[in-house]
Swiss-Prot record:
One MF term in the entry's GO annotations: glutaminyl-tRNA synthase (glutamine-hydrolyzing) activity
Family designation: Belongs to the amidase family. GatA subfamily.
Self-association and partners: Heterotrimer of A, B and C subunits.
Protein name, UniProt field: Glutamyl-tRNA(Gln) amidotransferase subunit A
Role, per record: Allows the formation of correctly charged Gln-tRNA(Gln) through the transamidation of misacylated Glu-tRNA(Gln) in organisms which lack glutaminyl-tRNA synthetase. The reaction takes place in the presence of glutamine and ATP through an activated gamma-phospho-Glu-tRNA(Gln).
GO CC annotations, alphabetized: glutamyl-tRNA(Gln) amidotransferase complex
EC number: 6.3.5.7
A GO biological-process term: translation
Coiled coil segments of this chain: none
Catalytic reactions of this protein: L-glutamyl-tRNA(Gln) + L-glutamine + ATP + H2O = L-glutaminyl-tRNA(Gln) + L-glutamate + ADP + phosphate + H(+)
This protein's UniProt keywords: ATP-binding, Ligase, Nucleotide-binding, Protein biosynthesis
Keyword Cell membrane tagged: no
Phylogenetic classification of the source organism: Bacteria, Pseudomonadati, Pseudomonadota, Gammaproteobacteria, Pseudomonadales
Class in the EC hierarchy, top level: ligase
Length: 483
């Protein structure tokens, strides 16, 4: 039962082959047995899950029948969940229980999903390895000595290990797509504003976007359908009609124009990954796609620009955590200033402190024009590069990551090396574009992903390409040994 995809679960529930409660109990038992190896969950919500599963079964018995009704999933632990701890992977919020549900959580709950728990993540979503969590590193089920990617590493590891069929994640610079690539999943970052950020604890507000993580494009389409749509409570939400993502999955790729940027194949890319990217291109050509080379000339400036803009926004967003209203508070402060200093110094981990300091520096008087303003200008140039490319092609294809998963601890003391792992993913966030990673093979037994990018609000096109690719390849069906 645990091997089923979300779509298979939907069909099984509709055909009354099993109940949501039966499935939920099987998965909760599996999590209890296997997750100690992975550390993919921060909180389990067994009682809530059973209650929601029973309610879903009752709704189905009354004649209701939706694709997510009774489907089990987990939420990344930065989505507010009423009465349940929302820690953001940090000591700072270790005791925080939100008084409301995030829009993503409430929409999926209304569709009938069953919440099994909250997944582990890099502290405040800052990281590409899921090593900065206050609750310990998450392990990659494909090799327990390796990282699963980050910051949505808990969601990725749990789905890859078949602990559950799907999970929510967030993507600020690749935090859905990169862990999806490193754990053999399909992960989608929607267009900025497509999915509500209300109730999602912010890292960098102009870059953050929530999205689905699952084993197949078909499953991501089902989950995105339940997540997407305008939300008046989110000022950055865009009032754009939500199409039927599942309806376009089987569209032919004949005549689809795929662009491959020449700048993607630089010295930093593992040549074995480059080979797998070229093989995926050939598969899509067999399906009728037309492939041509495109150029993204400002790609080389993306990482410096991102690591000015994201920390700058983080330094502002995280200023609210001061030990006064909620969150961690130091013991016996001498005065208010001491309360602020010690609560933040003790409550935040080293990577979060590093990014706050970088961001505060970039925004400080005398440096704002030199750093932050210049970074925003580069952001505009990167967006323009994509607009020029999309004048000639429908989709852009390339690697998701320059390397497969690395050993836990290998890049802990070299943050720049970890930042470089975001090279291919951060441009979609800077430009606000939708991006998807899909399984494309293995290097040394570790999964590799290929990334697809499309114009604004063309998530359906990405899901269509990925689904058609998954009809002629079997990479996405491979499971890690022992799980």
């Amino acid at each position: 039962m645990h091997q089923m995809t979300l779509a298979e679960i939907a069909r099984g529930l509709a055909d009354k082959k099993f109940s949501s409660e039966e499935l939920t109990r099987v998965l909760l038992s599996r999590i209890a047995t296997l997750d100690p190896q992975l550390n993919s969950f921060i909180s389990l919500t067994e009682d809530l899950a059973i209650t929601q599963a029973q309610a879903a079964d009752a709704r189905r018995a009354a004649g209701e029948n939706g694709p997510l009704l009774g489907a089990p999933l987990a939420h990344k632990d930065l989505f507010c969940t009423q009465g349940i701890r929302t820690s953001c992977g940090s000591l700072m919020l270790d005791n925080f229980k939100a008084p409301y549900d995030a829009t993503v959580v409430s929409r999926l709950a209304s569709a009938g999903t069953v919440t099994l728990g909250k997944t582990n993540m890099d502290e405040f979503a800052m990281g590409s390895a899921n090593e900065s969590s206050h609750y310990g590193a998450v392990k990659n089920p494909w090799n327990l000595e390796c990282v699963p990617g980050g910051s949505s590493g808990g969601s990725a590891a749990a789905v890859a290990a078949r602990l559950l069929p799907a999970a929510t994640g967030t993507d600020t610079g690749g935090s859905i797509r990169q862990p999806a690539a490193l754990t053999n999943l399909t992960g989608l970052k929607p267009t900025y504003g497509r999915v509500s950020r209300w109730g999602m604890i912010a890292y960098a507000s102009s870059l953050d976007q929530a999205g689905p993580m699952a084993r197949t494009a078909e499953d991501c389409a089902l989950l995105l359908q339940g997540m997407a749509g305008f939300d008046p409570q989110d000022s950055t939400s865009i009032d754009e009609p939500v199409p039927d993502y599942s309806a376009s999955l089987n569209t032919s790729l004949k005549g689809l124009r795929i662009g491959v940027p020449k700048e993607y194949f630089s010295a930093g890319l593992d040549p074995r990954i480059a080979q797998l990217v070229h093989e995926s291109v050939r598969e899509l050509e067999k399906l009728g796609a037309i492939v041509k080379e495109v150029s993204l000339p400002n790609l080389q400036h993306a990482i410096p620009a991102y690591y000015v803009i994201a920390p700058a926004e983080a330094s502002s967003n995280l200023s609210r955590f001061d030990g006064v209203r909620f969150g961690y508070r130091c013991e016996d402060p001498k005065d208010l200033t001491d309360l602020y200093k010690r609560s933040r110094a003790e409550g935040f981990g080293p990577e979060v402190q590093r990014r706050i300091m970088v961001g505060a520096y970039a925004l400080s008087a005398g440096y704002y024009d030199a750093y932050y303003l210049q970074a925003q200008k580069i952001r505009r140039l990167i967006k323009n590069d994509f607009m020029n490319a999309f004048a000639d092609v429908d989709v852009i294809l390339g690697p998701t990551t320059p390397n497969p998963a690395w050993k836990i601890g290998a890049k802990t003391h070299d943050p720049i090396a970890e930042y470089l792992e975001d090279f291919y993913t951060i441009t979609a966030n800077l430009a606000g574009l939708p991006g998807l990673s899909m399984p494309a093979g293995f290097v040394d037994g570790l999964p590799v992903g290929v990334q697809l990018l499309a114009p604004y609000f063309q998530e359906g096109r990405l899901l269509n390409v990925a689904h058609q690719y998954q009809q002629v390849t079997d990479w996405h069906t491979r499971a890690p040994e022992g799980f």
